[in-house]
């Protein structure tokens, strides 16, 4: 009886902790979005933001800066950061490996290769590449790459070797992309180079509409599968015992993770370490790995991480702008190393 009461108390304590952490993340995200709107080459006072967002001073320079540059950019960082974090969480669950993420497994590189191929072909024919076309190309590249990784997984029992295989697949895709660039025209090379560095800048409102539809829809699907995801975390045998069709569920996980990763790669280029670092940090803060608790916090954490890194990327050495991947790697890599060392000590 005492043991049962203790377990109930611990569970209610964890639930309360999760609610508090999630609320704090939401508040931090709102503050960070406000900072992104205010800070830049043109400083916009915080008390001007509500008026600008409500449609006041529509013709002022501050209004144009917010509506045409900063707001689309910060929304892109928030949505794509959350998507990348969720994708990392799904892949870590799928492979049962804490360092699995779209960048490490080569999924981002595969998406980059197909987008580059499509971009060069279309630009060579003097045709613009639409936002849906970029997402479709990146999704195809993600699926092809993760398909290769899964084929390798059938022959390799060690998850560590699987990660190495994913890295090698990523290198092959990167080499193929560089090969394509060598034969592209000057304009294509410039476009591909700028895109491949990774950045949330340049997002139009049409891009934001596509990003929002894809990310919100897929994230809702991820949240809808929290129960089978919880069962899957406890092992395939347990998942089967509670009625989960494991083979079909694995396909669903791959499709959802690939779609999220593809959307990020299509609009921001390859972004590293977000998918590894954020899920670890979120689970450590929540003291829980239950998907129903981790998924919302993971999305908020990814949004905060990318919005913060983007603010640093565009303001630290202004007017020179850093690649978003350079900043995420600077902050993400030490976090991953620290967490792995902490786990090894335990």
Q: Language-model segments: which ranges?
A:
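Alpha-helical transmembrane segments in inner-membrane proteins
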Residues: 2-346
């Amino acid at each position: 009886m005492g043991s049962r009461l203790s377990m109930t108390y611990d569970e209610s304590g964890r639930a309360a902790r999760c609610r508090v952490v999630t609320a704090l993340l939401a508040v931090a995200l709102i503050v960070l979005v406000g900072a992104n709107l205010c800070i830049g080459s043109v400083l916009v006072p915080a008390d001007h933001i509500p008026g600008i967002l409500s449609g006041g001073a529509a013709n002022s320079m501050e209004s144009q800066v917010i509506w045409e540059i900063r707001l689309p950019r910060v929304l892109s960082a928030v949505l794509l950061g959350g998507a990348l974090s969720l994708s990392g969480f799904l892949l870590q669950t799928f492979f049962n490996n804490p360092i699995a993420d779209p960048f490490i497994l080569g999924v981002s590189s595969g998406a980059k290769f197909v987008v580059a191929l499509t971009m060069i072909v279309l630009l060579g024919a003097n045709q613009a590449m639409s936002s849906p076309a970029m997402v479709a190309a990146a999704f195809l590249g993600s699926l092809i790459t993760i398909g290769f990784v899964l084929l390798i997984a059938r022959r390799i029992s060690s998850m560590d070797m699987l990660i190495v295989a994913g890295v090698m697949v990523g290198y092959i895709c990167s080499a193929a992309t560089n090969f394509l660039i060598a034969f592209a025209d000057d304009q294509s090379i410039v476009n591909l180079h700028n895109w491949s560095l990774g950045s949330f800048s340049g997002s139009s409102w049409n891009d934001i509409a596509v990003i929002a539809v894809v990310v919100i829809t897929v994230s809702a699907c991820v949240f809808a599968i929290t129960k089978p995801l919880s069962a899957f975390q406890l092992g395939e045998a347990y998942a089967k015992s509670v009625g989960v069709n494991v083979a079909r569920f694995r396909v669903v996980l791959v499709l959802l993770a690939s779609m999220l990763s593809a959307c990020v790669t299509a609009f921001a280029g390859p972004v590293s370490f977000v998918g590894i670092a954020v899920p670890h940090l979120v689970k450590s803060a929540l003291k829980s790995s239950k998907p129903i608790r981790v998924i919302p916090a993971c999305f908020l954490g990814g949004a905060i991480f990318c919005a913060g890194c983007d603010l640093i990327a565009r303001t630290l050495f202004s007017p020179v702008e850093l690649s978003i991947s350079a900043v995420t790697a600077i902050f993400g890599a030490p976090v991953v190393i620290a967490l792995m060392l902490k786990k090894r000590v335990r």
